C-alpha cells in the first residue's frame, strides 16, 4: 500500500502540475486577456459550461477559491453578460450560476483554440506513445469515477 500512496503523492506533486501547466494553464494565460477576463474567470466559464448550472459552493470547490472571491468574480462575469444567477428551485436560499450564450461562445472559442494547441503538442508523440497516453488518461478517469464520484 505504501507504494501506491508514494506514487500518488509523487504524481500529484510532480507530474500533475506539469500536465496542468503545459497542457492547460499556459493557454488560459494566453487567451483570457483576449476575452477581457482573467484565467480564473475563464476556468470558471469552462466549468459552468460543462455543468450547465452549478451552485456557488460546487464552483468554489472546483476552482479551489474562497466564496468571497467567487462572489466578486461572478458579479464581474454577470456584469459582462457571461453568466446569470438563478434561484435553485430545490432550495430557494441558494442560487445556481448559469452560462449565457456570450459566455458559452467564449468557452467554446477557448476550447477550439485549446484543441488546436494541444493537437500541435500531442501530435509530436509517436503512435505508440499516443496510445499509451490515451490509455493512461482513460484508466485514470475510470478509476477516479469509480471510487471518487461526487
Q: Model-found features: residue ranges?
A:
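N-terminal helix-turn-helix DNA-binding core of bacterial DNA-binding proteins
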Residues: 25-66
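Charged, amphipathic alpha-helical coiled-coil/dimerization segments
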Residues: 76-132
Amino acid at each position: 500500500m505504501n507504494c501506491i500512496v508514494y506514487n500518488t503523492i509523487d504524481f500529484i506533486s510532480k507530474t500533475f502540475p506539469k500536465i496542468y501547466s503545459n497542457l492547460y494553464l499556459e493557454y488560459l494565460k494566453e487567451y483570457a486577456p483576449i476575452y477581457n477576463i482573467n484565467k480564473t474567470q475563464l476556468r470558471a466559464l469552462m466549468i459552468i459550461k460543462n455543468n450547465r448550472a452549478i451552485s456557488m459552493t460546487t464552483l468554489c470547490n472546483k476552482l479551489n477559491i474562497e466564496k468571497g472571491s467567487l462572489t466578486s468574480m461572478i458579479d464581474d462575469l454577470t456584469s459582462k453578460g457571461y453568466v446569470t444567477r438563478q434561484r435553485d428551485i430545490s432550495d430557494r436560499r441558494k442560487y445556481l450560476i448559469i452560462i449565457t450564450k456570450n459566455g458559452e461562445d467564449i468557452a467554446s472559442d477557448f476550447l477550439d483554440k485549446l484543441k488546436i494547441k494541444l493537437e500541435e503538442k500531442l501530435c509530436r508523440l509517436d503512435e505508440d506513445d499516443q496510445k499509451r497516453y490515451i490509455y493512461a488518461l482513460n484508466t485514470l478517469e475510470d478509476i477516479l469515477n469509480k471510487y471518487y464520484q461526487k
